[in-house]
Amino acid sequence: MAGKRTRKINEGVDPTKLYALTTAIGMVKERAVAKFDETIEVSMNLGVDPRHADQMVRGVVNLPNGTGRTVRVAVFARGAKADEAKAAGADVVGAEDLVEIVQGGKIEFDRCIATPDMMPLVGRLGKVLGPRGMMPNPKVGTVTMDVAGAVKASKGGAVEFRVEKAGIVHAGIGKASFDAKALEENIRAFADAVIKAKPAGAKGNYVKRVAISSTMGPGVKIEVGSVTAAPTA
């Protein structure tokens, strides 16, 4: 039954063809037929080798229409900064007590923020947070004195990205319930951020391939130019 359903969902998607962005979005939305609101993900194959330090691609982008998911935020801070984080809507706030909780394996958050003075303490959690991509980093705005701003950005649609071994960078950029225009705006914002994060060591063709998919649906390949070009009115 599952195989039959998969074949039906895949019908009409030519894996050898490149589709215009707006067409691809429509195809993915049509095939997002699961009983839950599927996440729409974009993946970009880049002409970089992240094994070289000068070809690492990472950054953060604030999606104009949010991600559609509830993001739980933890903040490592003390005193007034801890109060600011709580007022901004942080789900978990602490210092040594929060370090102990995380070291114990209890990670009930999706994103982690810290004030600079907390980093010697948070550094102990590298083996726990690092593999999950949650280690606070000033390059993506998660080590900051503006904890309120960072919490609000995280809750409001900030998405971190980091290139993986095969030169692929990907992220969830919305839900199947989003209208096509909102998804298009989010995809363009993500692609623009990745392009702006092009490292000095990147040679030749930077964006090689782009595809989008839903959680349970097939990948639909997109014409790179239709993602990087300015949208038509």
Swiss-Prot record:
Q: What does this protein do?
A: Binds directly to 23S rRNA. The L1 stalk is quite mobile in the ribosome, and is involved in E site tRNA release.
GO BP, sorted A to Z? regulation of translation; translation
> A GO molecular function for this record?
tRNA binding
A Pfam family this chain is assigned to: Ribosomal_L1
What GO cellular component entries does it have? cytosolic large ribosomal subunit
User: What is the protein's name according to its record?
Assistant: Large ribosomal subunit protein uL1
Record-stated family = Belongs to the universal ribosomal protein uL1 family.
Q: List, alphabetically, the InterPro entries matched.
A: Ribosom_uL1_bac-type, Ribosomal_uL1, Ribosomal_uL1-like, Ribosomal_uL1/biogenesis, Ribosomal_uL1_3-a/b-sand, Ribosomal_uL1_CS
Q: Which SUPFAM superfamilies match?
A: Ribosomal protein L1 (SSF56808)
Assembly and partners are described as:
Part of the 50S ribosomal subunit.
Question: Which UniProt keywords are given for this protein, alphabetically ordered?
Answer: Repressor, Ribonucleoprotein, Ribosomal protein, RNA-binding, rRNA-binding, Translation regulation, tRNA-binding
